[in-house]
Amino acid sequence: MARNACSVLILNLIIIYFKLNKKKIVFFYHPRKLLTFMHQFYIEDLLEDMSENYSVIYGHEVNINIGKKYFYIKQGYLKFILNIDLFISNNICDVFPPGSKKIYIHHNVYDDPWVPRNKEKVMCQRFLNYNFIYLSSKMQIKMVNEMFRRYDIGKFPNLKEIGYLRIDYLLRKYSEKLKIKKDSIVIATTQFEGFPEFTISNHLKDIIFELLNESSYNVILRPHPSNRAHIKIHELIEIFKHNTRFQCDFSENYVDSYAKSQILITDMSGTAYTFAFLTLCPVIFFLPNDDAIKKNNYDKLNFFLNRTKIGSTVRDVKLMSQEINKVLLKIKEYKESIQRLSKDIKYYGKAKKKFKEELDLIN
């Protein structure tokens, strides 16, 4: 409590100083400890060279010192921070500085579901506290628009198309690294508990065995950040710890693992299209319960409709190696298809510029 109170006092004094210097205050808040560092690097790049009319402050709940402009403050104390002009987050918050304009930046590139259907209405109601939702493309805007209207919510935040900030940053910063030799296959999962009908978690051991025994590729397991401490992950590490071709990647930035991977295997993680656009390499979706797509009314989403444009779908672990070989024969074809698909994102490569333009329009 004392630490939060101290942060409130210091922040309000800093804001007074900035206001005396005619600065507009941007406050970016990281509400989830486990996801803070995976977003930190590209968010800093986005905000640090804002025009001289803005001053940027960051808030977080991680129990370590992150940096000069970062302040530890529990979400409940945000209501005591005064005179913030623009409050921004890329995970949902429920408490805000009073009087601020509130912006949510969605952190996936495609129109994959954000939460299961049974949690969607509550999520939509939480979003009503925001003034704006920034999205990567018109397809995302269409999905979010339909999501609010599904629950008869007529008045919802202003939906803005800005492109995808993270991919733009990674392509700009790591263009040479992304050209390195591909000697791996990466398995990237969605949150185990998030979509239980689709999760790959119960098949991971068999998939890893299959890849190690039937291919010459190294195998990288990259769990969702919220599952890093999950018992299933640590059981897998224990099982495969003596195999030099296996590694588990807990890093905050996936670029190293993605750069050296020829194929990504996933269930329904939004990272599927991120990987494809970033590397121009194919994706294999492992979905043994494919019927759940139609049951949940996901069959009209581009995320599922366009799977064949970036890769293929497997429903049985025993068919994984066979499918990998088929996909490898069409690497050039997938590369061209992925490049065409990326052009559907209007501000691809221009997200940072578009973000700043939208910010400048807010009074």
Cite the ranges covered by each PLM segment.
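Membrane-proximal basic amphipathic "stem/tether" segments
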Residues: 1-33, 38
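Catalytic donor nucleotide-activated moiety binding site of glycosyltransferases and closely related
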Residues: 55-70, 212-249
